[in-house]
Every structure is written in structure tokens, then in C-alpha cells.
Amino acid sequence: MKRTYQPKNRKHKRVHGFLSRMSTPNGRNVLKRRRAKGRKKLSA
């Protein structure tokens, strides 16, 4: 049986990257929360 996670860099960036986070209000909320929490890495 094939494993479910077949990583692709382009897909990963497009779905979870910084620009995609910034492009929606909810994504901005995600970044805001992660900044408040003090995450070293904000997005993928």
C-alpha cells in the first residue's frame, strides 16, 4: 500500500507558505497568533 503523504515542495509552499497566509484575512490571523506565541518560524 502506498503511503498517504507524498511531499511536494511546490504544493507545500502554495498551501502553507507565507504569501498564501498573507493573502487571506484568516491566514493573517494565523500569522498574528504565531507571532504572539513567539514562533521562530511563522510559515512553511
UniProtKB/Swiss-Prot annotation:
It holds the Pfam family Ribosomal_L34. One of its GO terms (biological process) is translation. Residues 1-44 are annotated as: Disordered. InterPro entries: Ribosomal_bL34 (IPR000271), Ribosomal_bL34_CS (IPR020939). Keywords: Ribonucleoprotein, Ribosomal protein. Residues 1-16, 30-44 have a biased composition (Basic residues). GO terms for molecular function: structural constituent of ribosome. GO terms for cellular component: ribonucleoprotein complex; ribosome. Belongs to the bacterial ribosomal protein bL34 family. This is Large ribosomal subunit protein bL34. It comes from Heliobacterium modesticaldum (strain ATCC 51547 / Ice1).
